Amino acid sequence: AEFHIAQAVGAILEEDHQNGLAHFLEHMAFNGTEHFAGKGIIEYFESIGVNFGGNINAYTSLDETVYRLSEVPTTREGIIDSALLVMHDWACGLLLLPEEIDAERGVIREEWRTGAQANRRMWKAINPLKYPGSQYAKRDVIGDTAVINNFAYDALRDYYKKWYGPDNQAIIVVGDIDVDQIEQKIKALWANVPARENRGERPLYSVNDNEQ
């Protein structure tokens, strides 16, 4: 089965001094949650044949962040419960511990370095032409290295609490499952997911026409 949680939260919501936090949060989802300490998510699911990278992964774009568990065996109800518990923790239970944040700064820097190739430079050069005068031309998903290196721990926690909440989330489960049972399990788990703190209204950024 496939278990996805889609957050309507991407780099487009960042202020300049936050550029990179949406992507950083995505990485932190695999570095300790309420019910899965440390690398517990990866360790548990790899123990049942669900591989990190191919089947346990996530991505961040300008408009969304999506986390997924793919090809999860559904032969045992306990596995289904664990997969839904991971979705719950990604929704509201990231620990965001200082030592894990600092360790991940280096991972993101390396991702930034290895991605600084010709295609990325072309992307950055072309975007202002594709989206003239728009926030979409300005924002870079992987972020600003100065922000990545120096943001305060609470800056990431505040961003998480501000934007991650039930009104910005969708749970998708596809596979050989009992739909009614899964729906009831999701409702029970999400009953205690808190509303967003310091709730921000999600801005809608337009894309202007160009001559082409």
Residue ranges and their predicted role:
Residues 19-33:
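Active-site SXXK
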Residues 73-76, 176-180:
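Helix N-cap motif at beta-to-alpha junctions
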Residues 32-35, 69-104:
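M16/insulysin-pitrilysin zinc metalloprotease superfamily fold
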Residues 15, 19, 171:
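Active-site alpha-helix of zinc metalloproteases
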Residues 37-38, 179-183:
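Extracytoplasmic/secreted cell-surface and envelope-processing proteins
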Residues 1-13, 35-76, 100, 114-168, ...:
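Non-catalytic beta-strand/loop surface segments
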Residues 23, 67, 87, 108, ...:
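Divalent metal-coordination and catalytic microenvironments
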Residues 28, 86, 90, 111, ...:
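Generic, well-ordered alpha-helical scaffold segments in large soluble proteins
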